[in-house]
Amino acid sequence: FNYDASETLFGDRDRIVSAEIRGGYGKFMGRIPRVWYGNAYSRSGGLSDYVKVYGHDSTLPSFRCGGTVGPMPAGDPSFFWMGASSNYCIPSSPYFNDAQVTDPDFEAPQSWRGNLALDLVTAGGYKLTLEYNHDSVDQAVFYKELGLTRESIMADGRGVYSHGPGDFMLTNTGEGGAKATSFSVQKSFDNGLSMFGSWSSVSAEDVYPLTSAQAESAYGYTQRWDGENVPAARSSFMADSKIVVGLEYRTMLFGDNETRVSAIYINKSGEPYSITFDNSSYSPIGGTGYSAFRDDYSLAYIPTDANDPKVVFTSASVATDVMNHINNGPLAKYKGTYAPRNAFENPDYDRLDVRITQEIPSFMEGHKFLFYLDLLNVMNMLDDEQGRIFEYGYNTSRQIIADAMDDGRFEIKGVDPDDSLYLQDNDGQSRWQIQMGLKYRF
């Protein structure tokens, strides 16, 4: 809806030229990645052996079924499901003998979303917008491991689980949602200067971050405390706050050829991350043997002190190092329990980009050249310690080095304060760049 509230709210105030209230509410559903459904076809529980049915070298051994892999039929994808019976077997290990299924009642992810906004235009030409958005999950994705069985309980209350061959079911959860508040202002001045500024604050929760295509990876690479008791927690993709400021100046230094200088500054809080156990034995805490859970994705129990009965430190020096790390950082508030998923934040990030453009006359009427110069990440250009993004890989920091003991306690072997903290620069986002070019307009 849109409602002109100029007279209702500001009829007796000359400083407000117009006021509009707008909003809406409804159920929204986006596109569904087909790979979610594809898992049930690629891992049907049949007698196929992925290693045996194809290969670039027909002499390569098939480690699951014996014999050789056999040549891949060139240009014929049907061999995946119509191969000769000799290419099928019951694997000797369960790795590819799993069945991944889709709940017959599965519904595509959908949310109830609503927003309410107030747009103002002042007598001075300022445009102001205040907006609130609310998102409540109706159906989201949840994965279940159908063979999961709790075998015992550890000292902090989490279960220890065994499982079958890894049979995963794609189903739904109703948990999750988001709230966002934003404010923006923009103004153009008569002297060629214009400006824009905005601030936003977001609180978002989800259950599975869904960063992987395969069901076992989406399931396993989710930080958890107790089996499939995975409540909605802070989303790995949210930024608590973000500030954007833009300035632009236009003038004509010679003739009717425009000179434009633009700058945009961004400051945003870092993405959330979890602190987990670093499982030195490569056996996930909370799982037994070959587990559906992934190593190093068990949320860490935080000892109360060096004498905590739920843990065993391998030495006095290890106890001192670990407790110093806990007491002098954000883990201190979680002593005696575990730190929830995504309870911590990566470092904030600042960035400044500048663009300069200049029109240049051509020899033909109506034709012009446009020269442009981009200065990207100016803060890093001025100081190589600025303008850099540091994040924990997969939103996980494996800081407490530990293994599970047979009596349910945790054997703590050390601490790694910045495990998995990386400089993110795959796309050049943490380095300065200069680029220039020339366009011809006609």
Indicate residue ranges for each PLM-predicted region.
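Hydrophobic, lipid-facing positions within transmembrane beta-strands of outer-membrane proteins
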Residues: 1, 19-21, 102, 112-116, ...
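Residue-level signature of outer-membrane beta-barrel architecture
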Residues: 1-5, 27, 120, 187, ...
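Solvent-exposed loop/turn elements at secondary-structure boundaries
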Residues: 2-169, 289-292, 347
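Transmembrane beta-strands of outer-membrane beta-barrel pores
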Residues: 3, 25-31, 134-138, 201-205, ...
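Short loop/turn motifs that connect adjacent beta-strands in outer-membrane beta-barrel proteins
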Residues: 4-19, 124-125, 190-192, 252-261, ...
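Membrane-embedded beta-strand positions of outer-membrane beta-barrel proteins
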Residues: 21-23, 118, 130, 185, ...
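Extracytoplasmic gating/loop element in the C-terminal half of outer-membrane beta-barrel translocons
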Residues: 86, 260-363, 370, 395-422
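Gram-negative outer-membrane beta-barrel transporters
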Residues: 129-274
